[in-house]
Amino acid sequence: MDDAGKITSTSHLIVSPDEGTFLDLFKHIVLSDLGSGAKFFRASDQRVPATAAYYSRWPVSVFICKILQLFQMPAAMLGHLTDFLLNFYYQNHGFLGILRNIFLIRLKIPKRGEADFISTIGYLDSRMDLHGTPMVSHQADEVISNADNPSLKEGHNSKIKGALGNRSLMDLCIMASKLAYENTKVVERVVAEHWKMHFVADYGGMNYFQDARNTHAFIFCDKPKDANLIVISFRGTGPFSIPNWCTDFDFSLVGLGDAGSVHVGFLEAMGLGHRNSISSFETSINTKSPGSITELRKESEMAPDHLVWAYDGVYFLAASTLKGLLKDHKNAKFVVTGHSLGGALAILFTCILEIQQETEVLDRLLNVYTFGQPRIGNYNLGYFMQNRLNFPERRYFRVVYCNDMVPRVPFDDVFFTFEHFGTCIYYDSRFFGYFTKEEPSRNPFGIENAISAHITAWWELWRSFILNHVYGAEYKETWESRMFRILGLFLPGVAAHSPVNYVNSVRLGRELAIPLMSLKMMAQGY
């Protein structure tokens, strides 16, 4: 990257499950045939594929993606059917209601995209209200003033401690992350009626590699005029979306100069490029977003062909809207959040703002909270962002629940070196939280972790029947959530990824008396 903040190097290593066959994968794993393994790679340095084929854990990723791709159409059909049946059941008020409505000839047929059509994720956790009371404007004022209060900045110690203590903001973030899975009408209704806030926009950005408008984010403020808080929430991994899951397991990297290497799939999800045209990443990232959504739409009409697609991506849509809101609301600060893939996009959004040297925008960043976020880049990206984002105060908090598999992918190994950065808030299955540099058990498929993970899954299933008796009706789990926990008996890391666990962790979490890493060590930047 040069002095103007322009990306001048786009080295890359693309791992493509489609480039080889199951036979090639078998020959590589069983017969140690490096030539067969190298078929799955495409790199800027032609010497790299053979080295990568020898050293890394990529066969696990490729095998998982190839198996998942076999079920892409059935999974999509199952997702549509599940959504329809759940909405049909609840909109007609259960089995007896269905029979009654048939008899009265007033059976209700759910319509996707309507304000009462809830996603499967929404039925896993039916809570829509913020914890206690909505974060009304004066509470948003407190969040901002506390963040700016110098008396709270004793080193970094108090600031870190405040991350667990500021439950209203954390709760708003996890609820916004969960709400991002819903359609626009549901999002608008919940923001306005349940949270008493101001809905701004809901965007569906184009992913040109997957040829689908499947990246979503919505934006809202605490009030329509003189807002203090702006929130951007990115949608996470769809439970029945095979392309989303393959993106999480993808190993592909593209180098962005001094900023290190970034996950290709996440850049594509943001609409910032296409792996079959590596130069597209350089072009889009070297182009700053316009100052408002109105300016973006005007410029997109006159933009050259190589930028039209980028302007239709969720990054440019969200960044332009944010800039316009920051101009309109002079005292506002903004928060970026997301669950799962949405968490990766949330922190990547912030990284791109930094790479583009959007200093005026980043000066008004309050926090980034991600929940169950996968790794988005290598060590160099973390090194590039750490001092810029977490100094002089920590603004990026990565929340991880227990055995959740997604924060542990893509795998880190001696070749790809995917690594997290920022401050990790880790919650165990009893909702004890502590600060750490990295969540324990970095490899979700290690045999040494299998026994404890399955024991925890049994405990979580049993806990789902008693939590409401201990903490109140708010914590009564739906039968859909319990069914998902039964799946967790076989795949613990998948069931642990449920937003139910993250909402409960934020609301019931308490700090571990003797954390594995002390706050003092964290304050010293360990």
Curated annotation (Swiss-Prot):
Motif GXSXG, chain ranges: 338-342
Active site positions = 340 (nucleophile), 404 (charge relay system), 497 (charge relay system)
Q: Does the keyword section mention Transmembrane helix?
A: yes
Record keywords: Hydrolase, Lipid degradation, Lipid metabolism, Membrane, Transmembrane, Transmembrane helix
Task: Specify whether Disulfide bond is a keyword of the entry.
Answer: no
Gene Ontology cellular-component terms for this entry are:
membrane
Chemical reaction(s) catalysed: a triacylglycerol + H2O = a diacylglycerol + a fatty acid + H(+)
**What Pfam families has UniProt attached to this entry?**
Lipase_3
Protein's cellular compartments: Membrane
Q: Which residues cross the membrane?
A: 79-99
EC number(s): the record gives 3.1.1.3
- Domain of life according to the entry: Eukaryota
One GO term in the molecular function aspect is: triacylglycerol lipase activity
Record membrane topology: Single-pass membrane protein
How does pH influence this protein's activity? Optimum pH is 4-4.5.
One BP term from GO: lipid catabolic process
Give the UniProt family note. Answer: Belongs to the AB hydrolase superfamily. Lipase family.
What is the recorded function of this protein according to its Swiss-Prot or TrEMBL entry? Acid lipase that can hydrolyze a range of triacylglycerols but is not active on phospholipids. In vitro, hydrolyzes triolein, trilinolein, triricinolein, tripalmitin, trilaurin and tricaprin. May play a role in the regulation of lipolysis in germinating seeds.
Protein name (Swiss-Prot/TrEMBL): Triacylglycerol lipase OBL1
Q: What is the phylogenetic placement of the source species in the record?
A: Eukaryota, Viridiplantae, Streptophyta, Embryophyta, Tracheophyta
